[in-house]
């Protein structure tokens, strides 16, 4: 090689480019796609799509992209700065054993983690069954009639229980009582939730401080945060006598041995299923639960799986009672819950299927026995054990020696809980060993103590309370007995996965949901113990890796969005909305503007927006949209004038839910600011802005970022999610974690999935992120252009282009021949596709978002399917086929249809193979569901199907 060769060419360039794998269309296809959409280049497309006033192509400071290998090495280096000690901190978070068969075949399986929320039930039967197992598990443990399919975490579940108690209780009081022996993070979340709604939170001893006539409900801890187990029956009876509601915060492992809340008289039971096989993960994600009485089912928050029947009369699962939810009831919804924790609920349910009732009893009994031995040994050493009746946790008064005890425990590799005032808490779990117990004894005894004699002399009795042992049978349904060998369980999980459609099989073109690639490299770090086995309240000097990770994400999210500060605490987009509105509320109140309580929300907004505004104590005022789907600026001006001096905020989604960049967004922001309000820009559609526009620089004051959309955390069949918020510097003092504001139980929300988004940003870099946004916009316009001659595209921007999604109008087809959006959605299943978003934001339409990850071949396959369906509708329009005889009305077609008697007006091939015979064809496991029948005959736990259907 010549010696004078320029040094820049000495070393060969990297051959790996992650962005080219993340982005679907190949460079050779882009020219044809641009020709179809009518743009001369990608830059031309962006110039004609994004308003010039906000377009920003400059580098955002993210830096150059890393390869997958380099990004994983960087994350490994970050993880190595976390110290994995044995955690006995407790406080609602415990070490646990995730069975490897569940880790590999659920948590690490894209058939499970890339699925969407099961709103299309026919293609979601597998995860619906797993979630029904979860509901059955919770209902059994709690002894209550009905349980939901998960909430975000225990703290928010308790806040939801408070809200439910206020809705269903007979008391007219405005105060809610909280047991002082409740986890402190839960109390903080409850206080945050209550304050904007005008409810007082009274914290005290329920046996001495509770005046049942002065509260609408009470939260009792069972067991308490200290570990103490108290019989709540007298307190519950006193509450009921005054028309108040009794809620119990429970430990689901303790409920294996303790009497169920339902048997004790409780109306609501809540808790976290984390210790059923889900790692602590520095706070999450974990599936919380709520169970309640049948009478309250229509007021319960969160998703609810029920049993219905399909078109052949066979049992099938679906999401039930959806009229409770935010996407329908908006500000009148029971909650703003949207994303829940489906994947984690499924893991917890499989943990119960794996162990069965006998295994759970053995784990619970061993855990209690370890705690009893620990307590007895400490008493022998002369320690003052405050907790006398307990399941797994004890509290010791160590006085002035507490710091030394805690330090000696850390030196031996164990974290105990500093409970304050010289008190030390310690919790046992299924991973606790005799060596752990001995090390704790040694921490209390000090150096040189001989513990062998103590161990030999111990006479340990159980410390479970008399009269509170579980009396009801546990987990009697066959599903908790039928899959006990690993072979059987493996095949059961595979059979469930095969029933569903997820991103590993097909495009999921759901508008406003951003179902993009969840790259395998991004997922790998979440199971590393340095991320997974960290307690959220571990000492700061042990979690320097997480501190570095949080700082990286806060910096890059600020750079991407143009904001000045970020909070990572909200663990869903809806929680992010709520947190952002609380920040706005705090800002106004600090300035003496308590009267600012009006939240302006466009008619096209996500259902979570009005629900979140109501939770933040604001009044929702709807702003009209014009015929082009944009905010009607004249109506906005009128509403501002009508509510002069009271405007707190506007919540606006950008690009709009109609799939266009509104040209007047800067003017809208200026109008609201001139009226003294703040601009909440919903980040649900941020995938159309990253690298090309920054909300914080064109007028917005706060946004949430759906990390499970734009930044590649998978949807998990309905969760987990993350919804961090970015704010301008004037709102930074009011972020969660400051001034006592807590919207989630853990300080950094679902911290263990943050490496996914960090890896994505690292591997894309500035240019890759910009390319991803550009290609998302190209893909949406390509679909709009290909479908335009067959279905009207409802909204386009000023220059005739859509943003990252498009809306096709199907209403005229219903008017003409009676074909519904459901008919087309179900017919798409026969073509192997998940339907787009149905009837939102406009009834009778599809909202289609392909994302940047889908290649031209898959886009064409989808468009070909939609065009073929339009041809079938044309047959009905021409009178050659009656609508009731059309394959559209019988879709989806099942293997039972194919093999059974065929008395239909079209051929088997036309019905079952609309795209031609395909050896890899997806078959719906059930026919079309009868939704109304399912709500009329509600069953939300594993039923005896045969008798149920006959009945």
UniProtKB/Swiss-Prot annotation:
Pfam families given in the database record: GcvP2_C (PF21478), GDC-P (PF02347)
SUPFAM superfamilies: PLP-dependent transferases
CDD domains noted in UniProt: GDC-P
Keywords recorded for this protein, A-Z: Oxidoreductase, Pyridoxal phosphate
GO cellular component: cytosol; glycine cleavage complex
Location of N6-(pyridoxal phosphate)lysine modifications: 709
Protein origin, superkingdom: Bacteria
E.C. number(s) listed in UniProt: 1.4.4.2
Top-level EC class as recorded in UniProt: oxidoreductase
One GO term of the biological process aspect: glycine decarboxylation via glycine cleavage system
InterPro entries assigned: GcvP, GDC-P_C, GDC-P_N, GDC_P, PyrdxlP-dep_Trfase, PyrdxlP-dep_Trfase_major, PyrdxlP-dep_Trfase_small
Cofactor (UniProt): pyridoxal 5'-phosphate
GO MF entries: glycine binding; glycine dehydrogenase (decarboxylating) activity; pyridoxal phosphate binding
UniProt catalytic activity: N(6)-[(R)-lipoyl]-L-lysyl-[glycine-cleavage complex H protein] + glycine + H(+) = N(6)-[(R)-S(8)-aminomethyldihydrolipoyl]-L-lysyl-[glycine-cleavage complex H protein] + CO2
Family of this protein: Belongs to the GcvP family.
Subunit-structure text: The glycine cleavage system is composed of four proteins: P, T, L and H.
Function field: The glycine cleavage system catalyzes the degradation of glycine. The P protein binds the alpha-amino group of glycine through its pyridoxal phosphate cofactor; CO(2) is released and the remaining methylamine moiety is then transferred to the lipoamide cofactor of the H protein.
Protein name: Glycine dehydrogenase (decarboxylating)
Organism from which the protein derives: Gluconobacter oxydans (strain 621H) (Gluconobacter suboxydans)
Biological classification of the source: Bacteria, Pseudomonadati, Pseudomonadota, Alphaproteobacteria, Acetobacterales
